[in-house]
Amino acid sequence: MTKGTIQNQESFLNRIASSLGRERRTGGVAVPEWAHQPQYKTLEGYSADDLVTVLKNHCVKIHTELIETDSTGLYDALREQVSRFSGGPVIIPKDPRFEEYGLKSLLTKDWPSEGTPVWEWDADKGEENIKKAEQANVGITFSEITLAESGTVVLFSSKDIGRSVSLLPTTYIAIVPKSSIVPRMTQASDIIRQNIANGVTVPSCINYITGPSNSADIEMDLVVGVHGPVKAAYILVSDR
Protein backbone atom coordinates (compact mmCIF):
# COMPACT_ATOMS: atom_id res chain seq x y z
CA MET A 1 0.00 0.00 0.00
CA THR A 2 1.30 3.46 -0.93
CA LYS A 3 2.10 5.62 2.06
CA GLY A 4 0.34 8.98 2.02
CA THR A 5 1.89 12.40 2.55
CA ILE A 6 0.82 15.14 4.93
CA GLN A 7 0.88 18.70 3.65
CA ASN A 8 0.71 22.01 5.52
CA GLN A 9 0.79 20.25 8.89
CA GLU A 10 3.03 22.78 10.62
CA SER A 11 1.13 25.85 9.46
CA PHE A 12 -2.16 24.20 10.40
CA LEU A 13 -1.01 23.37 13.94
CA ASN A 14 0.60 26.79 14.40
CA ARG A 15 -2.65 28.46 13.44
CA ILE A 16 -4.58 26.43 16.02
CA ALA A 17 -2.06 27.29 18.75
CA SER A 18 -2.23 30.96 17.78
CA SER A 19 -6.02 30.91 17.98
CA LEU A 20 -5.71 29.47 21.48
CA GLY A 21 -3.40 32.34 22.41
CA ARG A 22 -0.33 30.26 23.19
CA GLU A 23 2.80 28.75 21.67
CA ARG A 24 2.87 25.27 20.17
CA ARG A 25 3.56 22.49 22.65
CA THR A 26 6.11 20.22 21.03
CA GLY A 27 7.33 18.25 24.03
CA GLY A 28 6.17 16.72 27.26
CA VAL A 29 2.80 15.70 25.85
CA ALA A 30 1.65 12.25 26.95
CA VAL A 31 -1.55 10.27 26.74
CA PRO A 32 -3.20 10.41 30.17
CA GLU A 33 -3.68 7.26 32.23
CA TRP A 34 -7.35 7.25 33.13
CA ALA A 35 -8.26 5.97 36.60
CA HIS A 36 -11.34 4.20 35.26
CA GLN A 37 -11.42 2.33 31.95
CA PRO A 38 -14.78 0.52 31.78
CA GLN A 39 -14.33 -0.22 28.09
CA TYR A 40 -12.00 -3.08 29.03
CA LYS A 41 -14.47 -4.58 31.53
CA THR A 42 -17.14 -5.44 28.96
CA LEU A 43 -16.94 -9.17 28.14
CA GLU A 44 -13.74 -9.37 30.18
CA GLY A 45 -12.61 -12.95 30.73
CA TYR A 46 -14.80 -14.41 28.00
CA SER A 47 -13.33 -17.43 26.25
CA ALA A 48 -13.24 -17.80 22.46
CA ASP A 49 -16.35 -19.99 22.62
CA ASP A 50 -18.11 -17.47 24.87
CA LEU A 51 -17.43 -14.73 22.31
CA VAL A 52 -18.86 -16.93 19.56
CA THR A 53 -22.07 -17.24 21.58
CA VAL A 54 -22.24 -13.47 22.03
CA LEU A 55 -21.69 -12.98 18.30
CA LYS A 56 -24.38 -15.51 17.38
CA ASN A 57 -26.93 -13.91 19.68
CA HIS A 58 -26.27 -10.44 18.34
CA CYS A 59 -26.44 -11.56 14.71
CA VAL A 60 -30.11 -12.35 15.33
CA LYS A 61 -30.68 -8.74 16.35
CA ILE A 62 -28.97 -7.31 13.26
CA HIS A 63 -30.83 -9.54 10.77
CA THR A 64 -27.68 -11.43 9.82
CA GLU A 65 -27.48 -15.18 9.35
CA LEU A 66 -24.46 -16.84 10.97
CA ILE A 67 -23.34 -20.21 9.63
CA GLU A 68 -20.82 -22.25 11.61
CA THR A 69 -18.42 -24.58 9.82
CA ASP A 70 -14.75 -25.52 9.67
CA SER A 71 -12.11 -25.42 6.94
CA THR A 72 -13.31 -28.74 5.53
CA GLY A 73 -16.93 -27.61 5.31
CA LEU A 74 -16.30 -24.04 4.14
CA TYR A 75 -16.53 -24.91 0.44
CA ASP A 76 -20.04 -26.33 0.81
CA ALA A 77 -21.16 -23.67 3.29
CA LEU A 78 -20.17 -20.83 0.95
CA ARG A 79 -21.69 -22.56 -2.05
CA GLU A 80 -24.99 -23.09 -0.23
CA GLN A 81 -25.16 -19.54 1.12
CA VAL A 82 -24.60 -18.00 -2.31
CA SER A 83 -27.38 -20.26 -3.60
CA ARG A 84 -29.69 -19.02 -0.82
CA PHE A 85 -28.88 -15.49 -1.95
CA SER A 86 -30.05 -16.49 -5.48
CA GLY A 87 -26.61 -17.06 -6.98
CA GLY A 88 -24.23 -14.78 -8.84
CA PRO A 89 -22.70 -12.77 -10.26
CA VAL A 90 -20.10 -12.91 -7.49
CA ILE A 91 -17.32 -10.41 -6.76
CA ILE A 92 -14.32 -11.04 -4.50
CA PRO A 93 -11.18 -9.10 -3.56
CA LYS A 94 -7.75 -10.27 -4.67
CA ASP A 95 -6.97 -12.12 -1.46
CA PRO A 96 -4.64 -15.15 -1.12
CA ARG A 97 -6.78 -16.47 1.72
CA PHE A 98 -9.37 -17.75 -0.76
CA GLU A 99 -6.79 -20.28 -1.94
CA GLU A 100 -5.49 -20.92 1.58
CA TYR A 101 -9.02 -21.74 2.73
CA GLY A 102 -9.59 -24.21 -0.13
CA LEU A 103 -11.93 -22.05 -2.21
CA LYS A 104 -9.88 -21.57 -5.37
CA SER A 105 -11.58 -24.36 -7.34
CA LEU A 106 -15.03 -23.04 -6.42
CA LEU A 107 -14.19 -19.52 -7.54
CA THR A 108 -12.14 -20.24 -10.66
CA LYS A 109 -13.63 -23.49 -11.98
CA ASP A 110 -16.83 -24.78 -10.42
CA TRP A 111 -18.95 -21.64 -10.35
CA PRO A 112 -17.79 -20.34 -13.76
CA SER A 113 -18.43 -23.75 -15.37
CA GLU A 114 -21.97 -23.68 -13.96
CA GLY A 115 -22.64 -20.23 -15.38
CA THR A 116 -22.01 -18.24 -12.20
CA PRO A 117 -19.68 -15.35 -13.08
CA VAL A 118 -16.94 -14.56 -10.55
CA TRP A 119 -15.01 -11.29 -10.76
CA GLU A 120 -11.77 -10.90 -8.82
CA TRP A 121 -10.83 -7.31 -8.01
CA ASP A 122 -8.01 -6.16 -10.27
CA ALA A 123 -6.33 -2.86 -9.42
CA ASP A 124 -5.20 -2.48 -13.03
CA LYS A 125 -8.82 -2.50 -14.25
CA GLY A 126 -9.77 0.68 -12.37
CA GLU A 127 -13.40 1.72 -12.78
CA GLU A 128 -14.35 -1.63 -14.30
CA ASN A 129 -14.11 -3.11 -10.80
CA ILE A 130 -16.79 -0.73 -9.56
CA LYS A 131 -19.07 -1.55 -12.49
CA LYS A 132 -18.68 -5.25 -11.74
CA ALA A 133 -19.49 -4.61 -8.07
CA GLU A 134 -22.64 -2.72 -9.09
CA GLN A 135 -23.72 -5.67 -11.23
CA ALA A 136 -22.86 -8.34 -8.65
CA ASN A 137 -25.49 -10.10 -6.59
CA VAL A 138 -23.03 -11.32 -3.94
CA GLY A 139 -19.85 -9.76 -2.55
CA ILE A 140 -17.56 -11.97 -0.47
CA THR A 141 -14.68 -10.86 1.78
CA PHE A 142 -12.77 -12.01 4.85
CA SER A 143 -13.22 -10.27 8.20
CA GLU A 144 -9.91 -8.95 9.56
CA ILE A 145 -11.29 -8.37 13.06
CA THR A 146 -14.75 -9.36 14.30
CA LEU A 147 -16.52 -7.62 17.19
CA ALA A 148 -18.65 -10.03 19.20
CA GLU A 149 -20.55 -7.36 21.13
CA SER A 150 -22.04 -5.66 18.06
CA GLY A 151 -21.80 -8.37 15.39
CA THR A 152 -19.40 -6.22 13.39
CA VAL A 153 -16.84 -7.29 10.80
CA VAL A 154 -13.83 -5.04 10.23
CA LEU A 155 -12.42 -4.71 6.71
CA PHE A 156 -9.09 -3.19 5.69
CA SER A 157 -9.29 -1.70 2.20
CA SER A 158 -6.32 -1.68 -0.17
CA LYS A 159 -5.62 -1.62 -3.89
CA ASP A 160 -6.52 -5.32 -3.99
CA ILE A 161 -9.46 -5.15 -1.58
CA GLY A 162 -11.83 -2.47 -2.82
CA ARG A 163 -14.57 -1.12 -0.58
CA SER A 164 -17.09 -1.64 -3.39
CA VAL A 165 -16.89 -5.43 -2.95
CA SER A 166 -18.81 -5.25 0.33
CA LEU A 167 -20.86 -2.13 -0.43
CA LEU A 168 -22.41 -2.32 -3.90
CA PRO A 169 -23.63 -5.93 -4.40
CA THR A 170 -27.20 -6.79 -3.44
CA THR A 171 -26.02 -9.22 -0.76
CA TYR A 172 -22.83 -9.67 1.24
CA ILE A 173 -21.03 -12.63 2.83
CA ALA A 174 -18.18 -12.27 5.33
CA ILE A 175 -15.91 -15.23 6.02
CA VAL A 176 -15.10 -14.96 9.73
CA PRO A 177 -12.09 -16.85 11.14
CA LYS A 178 -12.81 -17.71 14.77
CA SER A 179 -9.40 -16.31 15.69
CA SER A 180 -10.50 -12.88 14.45
CA ILE A 181 -13.22 -12.51 17.12
CA VAL A 182 -12.58 -9.98 19.90
CA PRO A 183 -14.98 -8.60 22.52
CA ARG A 184 -15.61 -5.13 21.07
CA MET A 185 -14.25 -2.07 19.28
CA THR A 186 -11.86 -1.42 22.18
CA GLN A 187 -9.77 -4.46 21.28
CA ALA A 188 -9.98 -3.73 17.55
CA SER A 189 -8.59 -0.25 18.17
CA ASP A 190 -5.78 -1.76 20.26
CA ILE A 191 -4.87 -4.11 17.41
CA ILE A 192 -4.75 -1.26 14.91
CA ARG A 193 -2.76 0.90 17.34
CA GLN A 194 -0.26 -1.93 17.85
CA ASN A 195 0.10 -2.36 14.09
CA ILE A 196 1.03 1.31 13.86
CA ALA A 197 3.58 0.91 16.66
CA ASN A 198 5.07 -2.06 14.81
CA GLY A 199 5.53 0.00 11.66
CA VAL A 200 2.71 -1.65 9.72
CA THR A 201 1.12 0.68 7.20
CA VAL A 202 -2.48 1.11 8.27
CA PRO A 203 -5.11 1.22 5.49
CA SER A 204 -6.52 4.64 4.71
CA CYS A 205 -9.99 3.07 4.74
CA ILE A 206 -11.07 0.83 7.62
CA ASN A 207 -14.71 -0.23 7.55
CA TYR A 208 -16.85 -1.46 10.42
CA ILE A 209 -19.79 -3.35 8.93
CA THR A 210 -22.65 -4.53 11.12
CA GLY A 211 -24.93 -6.74 9.07
CA PRO A 212 -26.97 -5.44 6.12
CA SER A 213 -27.41 -1.75 5.42
CA ASN A 214 -29.78 -0.13 7.93
CA SER A 215 -31.37 3.29 8.13
CA ALA A 216 -34.06 4.66 10.43
CA ASP A 217 -36.03 7.88 10.70
CA ILE A 218 -36.98 9.86 13.79
CA GLU A 219 -39.97 7.56 14.35
CA MET A 220 -37.58 4.59 14.46
CA ASP A 221 -38.97 2.98 11.31
CA LEU A 222 -36.16 0.71 10.13
CA VAL A 223 -35.39 0.39 6.43
CA VAL A 224 -32.88 -2.22 5.28
CA GLY A 225 -30.75 -1.89 2.16
CA VAL A 226 -30.92 1.85 1.53
CA HIS A 227 -27.19 2.42 1.08
CA GLY A 228 -25.68 -1.04 0.91
CA PRO A 229 -26.45 -4.77 0.79
CA VAL A 230 -30.03 -5.81 1.52
CA LYS A 231 -28.95 -9.09 3.12
CA ALA A 232 -25.79 -10.21 4.90
CA ALA A 233 -24.44 -13.49 6.22
CA TYR A 234 -21.37 -14.45 8.22
CA ILE A 235 -19.67 -17.83 7.77
CA LEU A 236 -17.74 -18.63 10.93
CA VAL A 237 -14.73 -20.90 10.36
CA SER A 238 -14.10 -22.60 13.70
CA ASP A 239 -10.57 -23.90 13.09
CA ARG A 240 -9.03 -20.74 11.70
UniProtKB/Swiss-Prot annotation:
InterPro entries: FTHF_cligase-like_sf, LUD_dom, LutC, NagB/RpiA_transferase-like. SUPFAM superfamilies: NagB/RpiA/CoA transferase-like. GO terms for biological process: lactate metabolic process. Induction: Is under the dual control of the transcriptional repressors LutR and SinR, which allows the lutABC operon to be induced during both growth in liquid culture and biofilm formation. Is induced by L-lactate, which relieves LutR repression. Disruption phenotype: Cells lacking this gene are unable to grow on minimal medium with L-lactate as the sole carbon source. Cells lacking the lutABC operon exhibit little or no defect in biofilm formation on MSgg medium, but form small colonies that almost completely lacked surface architecture when glycerol is replaced with L-lactate in the MSgg medium. Signal peptide: none annotated. Gene3D superfamilies: NagB/RpiA/CoA transferase-like. Belongs to the LutC/YkgG family. Is essential for L-lactate degradation and allows cells to grow with lactate as the sole carbon source. May also allow cells to utilize an alternative carbon source during biofilm formation, since it contributes to the formation of architecturally complex communities when lactate is present. This is Lactate utilization protein C. It comes from Bacillus subtilis (strain 168). The gene is lutC.
